[in-house]
């Protein structure tokens, strides 16, 4: 693993300034009530968890948080909404477009994660000034069906394609600790390497086993496994953050 970490660090230095980091702030603009059945997620309406369904945040509330984030040094503001897709939420989507425009007007980058998008919605987000869109694959194609069945792997790849075609940076990664094995972690990275362009960022998350979800009993992922996955991703996806 030491050799992998050394190689990963060397590759990273070839493509990025190792002395620079970007501070991002994430805000949940719509909590709970999601119709999806992602087995790890407290936001799903199918499980009894601590999350309570809420309405989409008002524009001004979001702008207050964005201003605070900028004052604290963040250069990117990310907004997440717990729902399956944007479709059918015209008023809510318009409010999100207004959020994107206003926050870009503050001089910040803006990222959203809003579930599935079609090509038109992706283009509207681009025109509003969206910098990046997060849509994780979660795990390998082979293991995916054991984590979620309400949305297909191809659905996720299609949204990523719409985002990329609109000229928005793609943020897409996965979660470790879902019960997958090493081959699934390799499979996830392999899927990313097959995209026409590598994602701008490849987040590697560790599962927080939340009571009430089907994965509440999963043990924490080991640090060495996390480190090995991050190192492998750096080597295979050298330009991704």
Where are these regions (language model features)?
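Flexible, acidic/Gly-rich N-terminal and inter-domain linker regions that tether
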Residues: 1-40
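Glycine-rich, proline-tolerant flexible connector loops at the mouths of alpha/beta enzymes
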Residues: 24-28, 48-51, 78-91, 143-144, ...
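Active-site beta-loop-alpha junctions enriched in small/polar residues
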Residues: 28, 44, 82-84, 109, ...
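Radical SAM/AdoMet-radical enzyme domain recognition
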Residues: 38, 75-77, 93-175
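Conserved alpha-helical substructure of the radical SAM core
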Residues: 45-78
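Alpha-helix N-cap and loop-to-helix initiation/capping positions
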Residues: 54-57, 88-95, 148-155, 180-187, ...
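Non-catalytic positions within long, well-ordered alpha-helices that form the structural scaffold/packing
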Residues: 67-71, 126, 164, 193-195
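Conserved C-terminal portion of the radical SAM core fold
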Residues: 76, 81, 105-106, 154-213, ...
């Amino acid at each position: 693993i030491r050799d992998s970490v050394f190689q990963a660090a060397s590759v990273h230095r070839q493509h990025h300034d190792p002395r620079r980091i970007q501070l991002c702030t994430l805000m949940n603009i719509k909590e709970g009530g999601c119709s999806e059945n992602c087995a790890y997620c407290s936001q799903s309406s199918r499980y009894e968890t601590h999350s309570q369904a809420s309405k989409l945040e008002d524009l001004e509330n979001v702008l207050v948080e964005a201003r605070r984030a900028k004052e604290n040094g963040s250069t990117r503001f990310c907004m997440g909404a717990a729902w399956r897709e944007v479709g059918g939420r015209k008023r809510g989507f318009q409010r999100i477009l207004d959020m994107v425009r206003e926050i870009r007007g503050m001089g910040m980058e803006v990222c959203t994660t809003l579930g599935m998008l079609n090509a038109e919605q992706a283009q509207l987000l681009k025109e509003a000034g969206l910098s990046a869109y997060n849509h994780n694959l979660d795990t390998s194609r082979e293991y995916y069906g054991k984590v979620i069945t309400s949305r297909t792997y191809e659905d996720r790849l299609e949204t990523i394609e719409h985002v990329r075609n609109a000229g928005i940076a793609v943020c897409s990664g996965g979660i470790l600790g879902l019960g997958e094995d090493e081959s699934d972690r390799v499979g996830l990275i392999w899927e990313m390497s097959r995209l026409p362009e590598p994602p701008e960022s490849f987040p590697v998350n560790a599962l927080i086993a939340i009571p009430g979800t089907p994965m509440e009993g999963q043990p924490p992922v080991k640090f060495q496994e996390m480190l090995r996955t991050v190192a492998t991703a750096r080597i295979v996806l050298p330009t991704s953050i």
